[in-house]
Amino acid sequence: MSDRVIIFDTTLRDGEQALPASLTVREKLQIALALERLGVDVMEVGFPVSSPGDFESVQTIARQIKNSRVCALSRALQKDIDAAAEALKVADQFRIHTFLATSTIHVESKLKKSFEDVLEMGINAVKYARRFTDDVEFSCEDAGRTPIDNLCRMVEAAINAGARTINIPDTVGYTIPSEFGGIIHNLFNRVPNIDKAVISVHCHDDLGLSVANSISAVQMGARQVECTINGIGERAGNTSLEEVAMILRTRQDLIGVHTNIKHQEIHRTSQLVSQLCNMPVQPNKAIVGANAFSHSSGIHQDGVLKAKNTYEIITPESVGLNQNTLNLTSRSGRHVIKHRLALLGYPEGSYDLDQIYTSFLQLADKKGQVFDYDLEALLFFSQIQEEPEHFKLNYLSVQSGGSIMATASVRMKVGDEEVTEAATGNGPVDAVYQCINRITGYEINISKYDLKSKGIGKDALGQVDIVAEFKGRKFHGMGLATDIVESSAQALVHVINNIYRALQVAEHKERFAQKTVMETL
């Protein structure tokens, strides 16, 4: 049996289902490239048959990723498998992942079929998927609650049909480690062709046991773990990639397996996913939380100063958390900025140095000192704003306080024109939003507003994340500035530009549809 555990990341498929607003294709690609740098073996990036947008994102990612295997999900239906194969065919290497429920409650209540019918459906789905690729994965949905005799029959049949990976999900997070490990142990003892496939596990965290169940399964012979960055996912989430990777690395003495994960990329990837998905990492989250390497107890501090391993079983550096607090100022040159970014894991060529340096100088003039977390924030925001903006904030002024009604004046570039608007509101942010909405003419409802501090003290940057609803769709926007009102305005302008692009796409599709109709007449 192999001593390597395959890491199958499903952040962009299962993880995205938990998000307050869908990611754009560009944002998904940004995460996919980060996952590739992290060293994931397989990345499941979407469910192509579910929507044209999902199909497009899977196809875009499949075309760009070279060092990881790209996977798409499909039900055990030919139309689903066709869509997955079509989206993936541009990839250097790809996998089709098809699934079917096997538990009694799912078979009888959801599928309304006999288990024999389900068994035949599973066999047919795997055989059909094998027409497109040798790399087919089959999942027994709700395996954790499937009678073991039925589960063994399904696994054996799927392997005989051509599945090279068999996934055993604890779909509702119901099992405990000894129980789930026992299921894997049973499969290895009772399925005669088990050596012809890799056994995978996909555990949910409804009882807080997803990571523990996954590790128990690995100890019993599973050699693929399906997981997400920061453990994001439906309901209580999925198995946390960073926790599994660091457990297998830290306790290799006990478990005896390894992964291909580049551990120094963990923190950077976690932060990117958190920011793009608008899902803050809880401070006490293992491995990547803000407090994961903090020591407040005097006894602990004394011990760590004498020998770090008294209270630290892993180092911050091992997950890419650079603790160097070297401050940068407006007197720092381009070479220094390039050097700092390289130390943070951003090689030259992965960003526009001139653009970053200009933003850095503007921030340094405001703050005096700029820290590593400021640089990463500037880099992140420069990357998501590379596309030309139809709407651009040029100027804003706000008056408020005491008995004065909040009043704002905003000047924006709209296409090639410049438009100015003034408005009052229930506070300075609302007044600015009233101005922006008047300028754009969009009727927007802000359903979520979140303010986070990026840094320490009075000069910290304020990051504003909002979710806005427009014509039944949700759009996500972010802004970053030392002034909260300014970062709030930036976030709404980000939303406005996303809406504008969506409307442009819809208009293009409508014109294309009309042209197609005319050509058929």
Curated annotation (Swiss-Prot):
Its cofactor is Mn(2+). It is found in: Cytoplasm. It comes from the Bacteria. The gene is leuA. This is 2-isopropylmalate synthase. It is an enzyme of class 2 (transferase). Catalyzes the condensation of the acetyl group of acetyl-CoA with 3-methyl-2-oxobutanoate (2-ketoisovalerate) to form 3-carboxy-3-hydroxy-4-methylpentanoate (2-isopropylmalate). One of its GO terms (biological process) is L-leucine biosynthetic process. Residues 5-267 form the Pyruvate carboxyltransferase domain. GO terms for cellular component: cytosol. Belongs to the alpha-IPM synthase/homocitrate synthase family. LeuA type 1 subfamily. It catalyses: 3-methyl-2-oxobutanoate + acetyl-CoA + H2O = (2S)-2-isopropylmalate + CoA + H(+). It comes from Tolumonas auensis (strain DSM 9187 / NBRC 110442 / TA 4). Mn(2+) binds at D14, H202, H204, N238. The keyword Ligase does not apply. Coiled coil: none annotated. CDD domains: DRE_TIM_IPMS.
